[in-house]
Each structure stands twice: as C-alpha cells, then as structure tokens.
C-alpha cells in the first residue's frame, strides 16, 4: 500500500475541518468529497471481495449444449479490460485544487487585513479618553464635519439639534 493510500485511510476528516476552522462552501465541498471518497472505497472493496474466476467445467457438466460454454469461455479468455484515460479527471482535480488554493490565499489575505484593522481599532479604543473628558476642539479636529454642521445651523438660525428633545426631553420652563 502506498504512502498516500495509508495517509488517506488514517485521515480524520472531522478533525481536519474543525482544526482548520473551515466553514461555509469549503467545509461543504470537503464533506461532499469525503462522502464520494467513502462510497468509491466501499464499492472497490465490494468488487474486490467478489470471486473473479469462472468454473467452466461445472457449466459443461450441467448444460447439455457445451458449445455455448466453449464460446463463452473463449470470449472470457480473450477479453481485455478497456483502459480508461483519467488525465481529464486529473486535470479537473488539479484545476479544482489550484482554485481552492487561490481561494484560501485570498481568504487568508482578507482575514489578515481584518485582524490588522481590528487590532488597530482595539488599540484606539483602549487608548481613547472617556467621552466626557473630550473638548469641543478635539471633537472638531477628529470630525471636521461637526464644525461645518454647527456653522450651517447657526447661519440658518437653528439652535435646536434634531432629535435631541425626543431623546433627552425638553427642559424649558415655559
């Protein structure tokens, strides 16, 4: 038995999926591949367990017409199995493998970028001062559109912030 067959027999598919944290389409494809592989192995073992020799002498003793048995034996001995060209299937598998590797590399890049962004955000959150300690100048420096919006509201004579009364209530005495 070759090393590849030995490794394939010992492969724990559930552990592979869980240890690589595969989800979605990749996990589904791997599971369906495992299912097809198991079915092919089962059929191979079933066919290998069947007897391959034919006892023609038994059929000659049972049947009256031995010519038929002779012809069948002649066909049986002259039969040569057809060799199948599997290069097309192998090229399809190689194409699938290369596509899977490309998808994995792309996913790895996306995950690495997302992790970098999340770490940066976490550092910003951890190093940020509490909101109640910020000054107006610091807010307008961080978000210049706030200053522009306030200036526009003052020009139009609006002194109320939309939604403020609904959220915090009206504190006017009148």
From Swiss-Prot:
Superkingdom, taxonomy of origin: Eukaryota
Protein's membrane topology: Peripheral membrane protein
GO-annotated molecular function: proton transmembrane transporter activity
Signal peptide: none
Major localisation: mitochondrion
Localisation: Mitochondrion inner membrane
Assigned GO CC terms: mitochondrial inner membrane; proton-transporting ATP synthase complex
Pfam families recorded: Mt_ATP-synt_D (PF05873)
Keywords: Acetylation, ATP synthesis, CF(0), Hydrogen ion transport, Ion transport, Membrane, Mitochondrion, Mitochondrion inner membrane, Transport
Listed GO biological process terms: proton motive force-driven ATP synthesis
InterPro entries: ATP_synth_F0_dsu_mt, ATP_synth_F0_dsu_sf_mt
Modified residues annotated as N-acetylserine in this record: 2
Mitochondrion as UniProt keyword: yes
Role played: Mitochondrial membrane ATP synthase (F(1)F(0) ATP synthase or Complex V) produces ATP from ADP in the presence of a proton gradient across the membrane which is generated by electron transport complexes of the respiratory chain. F-type ATPases consist of two structural domains, F(1) - containing the extramembraneous catalytic core, and F(0) - containing the membrane proton channel, linked together by a central stalk and a peripheral stalk. During catalysis, ATP synthesis in the catalytic domain of F(1) is coupled via a rotary mechanism of the central stalk subunits to proton translocation.
Similarity section: Belongs to the ATPase d subunit family.
Protein name (database record): ATP synthase subunit d, mitochondrial
Organism, as annotated: Kluyveromyces lactis (strain ATCC 8585 / CBS 2359 / DSM 70799 / NBRC 1267 / NRRL Y-1140 / WM37)
Lineage: Eukaryota, Fungi, Dikarya, Ascomycota, Saccharomycotina
